[in-house]
């Protein structure tokens, strides 16, 4: 086959010289088109799942879910924590909260005055160093599924703990899966017999936490421990509207 001059400009042979920008695309735009196509394919795969998931409501943080938070502060106490060890926060034996230096009980009466429905229970602990200019972190370990007859040790050795959350505040959810808390008059039970309040009312329906606190310091540190229980109360809507009229 001889030389054919027309083949120089044949588009089918790929030798066409394009000099206008209408037929040119930058490499970045080509990559963006590929990325958008992948995104559309991924969205098409997730559409059936999203249709089912849209039927459910969840919260990113269960503590910030629906309901009213009612706090009962059990005690504030100063503890001395030795290096490489962790101390038990409370042993749940009435008012004997392992006091060392001093203990101040905050709540004399139960804050829930009516028979409300308890949706959730949280154990909250706040930690603060007692001496200024101390550079260490608070460590923590806890257990929820301990046997009721298990006697916890007051001091344990640190072994793979984790750091306490931001602002030195940590919350632990004590709810048992599949257990509903009954409507009871918690205020009268709490005021009449505080020592038996936990064993008779709370622990049959919620986990009894064993919480240990330590520090990363190489010296003996004095820390302030504030222990609270946070009850999440269901807020009931009124049976009848408070106002009548066209606007309601």
UniProtKB/Swiss-Prot annotation:
Keywords, sorted A to Z: Viral occlusion body
Superkingdom of the organism of origin: Viruses
One Pfam family this sequence matches: Polyhedrin
UniProt keyword annotation of Cell membrane present: no
InterPro entries: Polyhedrin (IPR001746)
GO cellular component, as recorded: viral occlusion body
UniProt KW Ubl conjugation keyword: no
GO MF annotation, one: structural molecule activity
Family: Belongs to the polyhedrin family.
Function of the protein: Component of the virus occlusion bodies, which are large proteinaceous structures, that protect the virus from the outside environment for extended periods until they are ingested by insect larvae.
Name of this protein: Granulin
Species assigned in the record: Adoxophyes orana granulovirus (AoGV)
């Amino acid at each position: 086959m001889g030389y054919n001059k027309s083949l120089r400009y044949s588009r089918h042979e790929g030798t066409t010289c394009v000099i206008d920008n209408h037929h040119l695309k930058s490499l970045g735009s080509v990559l963006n088109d590929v990325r958008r196509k992948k995104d559309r394919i991924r969205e098409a795969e997730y559409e059936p799942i999203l249709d089912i998931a849209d039927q459910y409501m969840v919260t990113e943080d269960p503590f910030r879910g629906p309901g009213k938070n009612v706090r009962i502060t059990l005690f504030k106490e100063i503890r001395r924590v030795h290096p490489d060890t962790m101390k038990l926060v409370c042993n749940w034996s009435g008012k004997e909260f392992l006091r060392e230096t001093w203990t101040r009980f905050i709540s004399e009466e139960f804050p829930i005055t009516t028979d409300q429905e308890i949706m959730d229970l949280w154990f909250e602990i706040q930690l603060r160093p007692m001496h200024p200019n101390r550079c260490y972190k608070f460590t923590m370990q806890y257990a929820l599924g301990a046997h009721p007859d298990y006697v916890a040790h007051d001091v344990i050795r640190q072994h793979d703990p984790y750091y306490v959350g931001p602002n030195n505040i940590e919350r632990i959810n004590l709810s048992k899966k599949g257990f509903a808390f009954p409507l009871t008059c918690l205020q009268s039970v709490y005021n009449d017999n505080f020592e038996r309040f936990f064993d008779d009312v709370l622990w049959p329906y919620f986990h009894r936490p064993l919480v240990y606190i330590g520090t990363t310091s190489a010296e003996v540190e004095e820390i302030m421990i504030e222990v609270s229980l946070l009850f999440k109360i269901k807020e009931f809507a009124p049976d009848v509207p408070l106002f009548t009229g066209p606007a309601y």
